[in-house]
Swiss-Prot record:
This is Chromosomal replication initiator protein DnaA. Residues 331-454 are annotated as: Domain IV, binds dsDNA. SUPFAM superfamilies: P-loop containing nucleoside triphosphate hydrolases, TrpR-like. It is found in: Cytoplasm. Gene3D superfamilies: 1.10.1750.10, 1.10.8.60, 3.30.300.180, P-loop containing nucleotide triphosphate hydrolases. It comes from Prochlorococcus marinus (strain MIT 9211). Residues 1-84 are annotated as: Domain I, interacts with DnaA modulators. Keywords: ATP-binding, Cytoplasm, DNA replication, DNA-binding, Lipid-binding, Nucleotide-binding. ATP binds at G158, G160, K161, T162. The keyword Ion transport does not apply.
Amino acid sequence: MLTGNEVWVKVQQSLRGNLSKPSYETWISPTTFCNFERGELTLLAANDFSSAWLTNNYSRAIEEAAEAVIGESVKVIVKVKDDIQKSEASLPPRISIPAFHPPGDSKKTDSKPALNLRYVFNRFVVGPNSRIAHAAAMSVAEAPAKEFNPLFICGGVGLGKTHLMQAIGHYRLEIDPGAKVSYVSTETFTNDLIVAIRQDGMQSFRDKYRAADLILVDDIQFLEGKEYTQEEFFHTFNALHESGTQIVLASDRPPNQIPRLQERLISRFSMGLIADVQAPDLETRMAILQKKAEQDRVRLPRDLIQFIAGRFTLNIRELEGALTRAVAFASITGLPMTVESIAPMLDPNGQGVEVTPKQVMEKVSEVFAVTSDEMCSSSRRRPVSQARQVGMYLMRHGTDLSLPRIGEVFGGKDHTTVMYAIEQIEKKLSTDPQLASQVQKVKDLLQIDSRRKR
């Protein structure tokens, strides 16, 4: 029987043959074995960033390689070398909330979804854009159902609504570990309702949602047009409010701007406090970057912080994503963390990057886990066709190839097929966050590859 370290050696050998040489040498080779127990393979990365990158981008490939070696399911955990105890001690304890299981489902294990460990008040940067929402969140966390009930937090994507909501939950459970805190998305509420109806479990559904001491409901705008869900939510809201339960709701817009929302729900959502979260100003964006850099133990020069904060203005998620990409770029290329070095990577349009069709194919293949041969084939499997379309889109925007020439690269496809692919990706980028993230990842890899070869 192989030891854990021997398993990792064989996994590395497998990945060396499946990944590009730069990817293997940058991420897999420096990673060391820590422990293998009860199906969990624990690895050690050099720093916080490497740990996060491995987890987000290579954990599935490692798990598949390990499963091929030992013939059993494997879960990969990546920790930080020489800093495990410190990093674990710096985080608050994981807080679990019981999951809903309808009648007849008792054989299923409780999956215990948890509040995000990072969404606590001391990690939230307060600025003029969020001062009222933050103060209101603190108020209901300290004294639920006393002043603002419900608390309705609204604002655009990535501005911190979910962070504030979950921070309230963490705070309450820290004060009262026995409190019944329920954090749920509107989609989950709807899905639970559908399951309860199908399995004749409405009483269990109501008991589950109405037993909470504090209920946090995210993305309430998705109640739009769901008449039966709105009906049930109305009665749930009333029962909770009358029993003195604190209700916190979050939406991308105020109640009166949610289309096809019942007037009685609009009235109830508006009876407490509506706290708006706006996009952060320059000073707040700089403070957010500085705080994240400190949390990740990364030293950033002030002019680089100001450059990133001035370039990414829409929301916090975009801002922090830019910082993550900048740190990755500097880490992989070995370039200093300066505006001059980082600016090309943060060009949202990828301008100034010269790439070849071969590079595009390699990076798309790496990110989408589809081979170049598959992309050049006539396969219509969704993973293959999507990777092919992304490749065509990136070749159009990153090389000087004509549409017919791009079609030739992809196995002799017609130029109209290339045009259609480009149009499809351009449409999906604004509506499919996962695809947008994958495309951005390919662009980042192309940036890194391009700079390496200069």
